[in-house]
């Protein structure tokens, strides 16, 4: 699978696909840098006036509801409608779904047309139980708790989507295929925007791989392997963030193999 990952990255860096981001303001800078490091070309637009034209230019669309307000909701809804009309993959991160009524409602609306969805266990569980409350962006459940809901959601999605449940162990399903990924490092939970950027990596991989399940699996593995390599070089989360960008850019598969093959 490392060879397939390497092929996807080569395509990314050759084609430099444009990824349109309707995303939160907290992690926008780090997210854009992650895109650049792996070879994608991010557009971080906040204007409705250029939305349709930018979607035409884009190979994939990424929506992240981290900083939610009424203007963002309108733009996110219009983004997904235009993307579906133009047959562009929609990658969705339902940040803090289940924490508030509005986040849960917006997430349900966007989920229906998503190509890939990534959330923590509590966020994914909120799609199966509208009465369940989460604790903001932090998960109060394990990946194992969300497997059945994730599988059911993937089967129900209109676009045949892949669902990724992030945690100490990641779970990926498209309703038919299932896999787990046990990679990464605890430092990843100490950097704001790490999950947002992981979902962005899915968007980049999906722009060059038509199979959403495979794109999601490769994206998780690449991002978490780079996290493990970054951890070798630092003792705290501040430098970890910088070294992660370096590793995303370097693509040192010889060093990755020690973790991938163990």
From Swiss-Prot:
The Gene Ontology biological process terms listed for this entry are: thiamine biosynthetic process; thiamine diphosphate biosynthetic process
One matching Pfam family: HK
Question: What cofactor does this chain's UniProt record say it requires?
Answer: Mg(2+)
Record's keyword terms, sorted: ATP-binding, Kinase, Magnesium, Metal-binding, Nucleotide-binding, Thiamine biosynthesis, Transferase
Q: In which pathway does it act?
A: Cofactor biosynthesis; thiamine diphosphate biosynthesis; 4-methyl-5-(2-phosphoethyl)-thiazole from 5-(2-hydroxyethyl)-4-methylthiazole: step 1/1
Report residues binding substrate: 44, 193
Under NCBIfam families, the record lists:
PRK09355.1 (NF006830)
Work out whether the entry's keyword set contains Lipoprotein.
no
Native species: Chlamydia abortus (strain DSM 27085 / S26/3) (Chlamydophila abortus)
For this chain, the family text in UniProt reads:
Belongs to the Thz kinase family.
Q: Where does ATP bind?
A: 118, 166
Q: What CDD domains does the record tag this protein with? A: THZ_kinase
- Enzyme class (EC, first level): transferase
Q: Name one GO molecular function term.
A: ATP binding
Q: What is this enzyme's catalytic activity, as reactions?
A: 5-(2-hydroxyethyl)-4-methylthiazole + ATP = 4-methyl-5-(2-phosphooxyethyl)-thiazole + ADP + H(+)
As recorded in UniProt, its EC number(s) are 2.7.1.50
Q: Which InterPro entries match?
A: Hyethyz_kinase, Ribokinase-like
Q: What does this protein do?
A: Catalyzes the phosphorylation of the hydroxyl group of 4-methyl-5-beta-hydroxyethylthiazole (THZ).
- Tell me what this protein is called: Hydroxyethylthiazole kinase
């Amino acid at each position: 699978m490392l060879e397939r990952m390497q092929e996807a990255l080569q395509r990314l860096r050759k084609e430099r696909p444009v990824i349109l981001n309707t995303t939160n303001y907290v992690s926008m800078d780090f997210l854009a840098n992650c895109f650049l490091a792996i070879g994608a070309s991010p557009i971080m637009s906040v204007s409705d006036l250029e939305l349709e034209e930018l979607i035409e230019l884009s190979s994939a669309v990424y929506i992240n509801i981290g900083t939610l307000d009424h203007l963002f909701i309108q733009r996110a809804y219009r983004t997904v409608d235009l993307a579906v009309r133009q047959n562009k993959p929609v990658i969705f991160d339902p940040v803090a779904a289940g924490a508030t009524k509005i986040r849960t409602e917006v997430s349900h609306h966007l989920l229906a047309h998503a190509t890939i969805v990534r959330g923590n266990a509590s966020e994914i569980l909120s799609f199966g139980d509208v009465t369940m409350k989460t604790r903001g962006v932090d998960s109060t459940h394990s990946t194992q708790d969300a497997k059945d809901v994730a599988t059911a959601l993937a089967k129900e999605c209109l676009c045949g989507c892949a669902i990724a449940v992030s945690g100490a162990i990641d779970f990926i399903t498209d309703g038919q295929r299932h896999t787990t990924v046990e990679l990464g490092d605890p430092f990843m939970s100490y950097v704001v925007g790490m999950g947002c950027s992981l979902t962005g990596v899915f968007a980049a991989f999906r722009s060059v791989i038509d199979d959403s399940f495979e794109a999601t699996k490769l994206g998780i593995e690449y991002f978490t392997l780079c996290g493990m390599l970054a951890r070798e070089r630092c003792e705290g989360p501040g430098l970890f963030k910088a070294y992660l960008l370096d590793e995303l850019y370097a693509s040192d598969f010889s060093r990755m193999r020690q973790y991938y093959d163990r």
